[in-house]
Amino acid sequence: MRKKVLLMGRSGSGKSSMRSIVFSNYVAKDTRRLGATIDIEHSHVRFLGNLVLNLWDCGGQEAFMENYLSAQRDHIFRNVQVLIYVFDVESREFERDLVTFRNCLEATVANSPQARVFCLIHKMDLVQEDLRDLVFEERKAILLETSKDLETTCLATSIWDETLFKAWSAIVYTLIPNTPTLESHLREFAKAAEAAEVILFERTTFLVISSYSSESNPATDAHRFEKISNIVKQFKLSCSKMQAQFTTFELRGGNFSAFIVPYTEDTYILVVIADPEIESAVTLMNIQSARRFIEASKSASDGIQLQP
């Protein structure tokens, strides 16, 4: 099952940097050595079982953009599931970028009218902290008005914090065909295991696929999942540099315990238990039981097939 994703935006806006961090295990400081994308770079990323992201990273130089919108228009914009357009928040040519974005939208509507659009207002770390919300909301209002013919989501991003993982988790979530089923499984598992929270991560990228939070244990940090994605991925990279393999993580505090363990061939699961009296062995046994159940469910469906 292939899903075509276009990654577009002006040259230097940060498209290839974010792609390299999310899918190629780069750290933010190493993206400085990346050169400009020439024409189109194709990546086929096997994301979950039989789901393949067919990612088209389109070079943003003006000559390339003109070609995309003329000679290659039908070829590029046909059968697109998601258009990701990256805006450099510090660009001094926002109006010009907006014209190009509008042209890309017209091509998308003509060739892939059911596509979803994600506008990433990028490099937000360069904006003064107390002005970030204001700047983002101003740009968001303009972009939503411009893209009203397509379902559009605007997100603020930076390669230096968890916002990058939050944005790409949101994008990938729209491409997964059976998220209601996954959410139902996690909810039932959480109730059976008496878990405060359960989060499912894709194994390679550590993007959030699905989650469940108990109403009896409300969380205080809305960005906790993406922060965990970022932290664990950095830890996995550190393990790789030391020629060590990240397998399982367990943390026990005074009033909680947390486990990150392999769930299926394609996923990790994070389970947070608020009752400190529940033994680790019980939680791990519950995870093993749930693993068998979800594998059986997926193998019987036409959606993502998670293999042991």
Curated annotation (Swiss-Prot):
Pfam families: Gtr1_RagA (PF04670). Gene3D superfamilies: 3.30.450.190, P-loop containing nucleotide triphosphate hydrolases. Its EC number is 3.6.5.-. It is found in: Vacuole membrane; Cytoplasm; Nucleus. It catalyses: GTP + H2O = GDP + phosphate + H(+). Keywords: Cytoplasm, GTP-binding, Hydrolase, Membrane, Nucleotide-binding, Nucleus, Vacuole. GO terms for biological process: cellular response to starvation; negative regulation of autophagy; negative regulation of cell cycle switching, mitotic to meiotic cell cycle; negative regulation of TORC1 signaling; positive regulation of TORC1 signaling. One of its GO terms (cellular component) is fungal-type vacuole membrane. This is GTP-binding protein gtr1. It comes from Schizosaccharomyces pombe (strain 972 / ATCC 24843) (Fission yeast). The gene is gtr1.
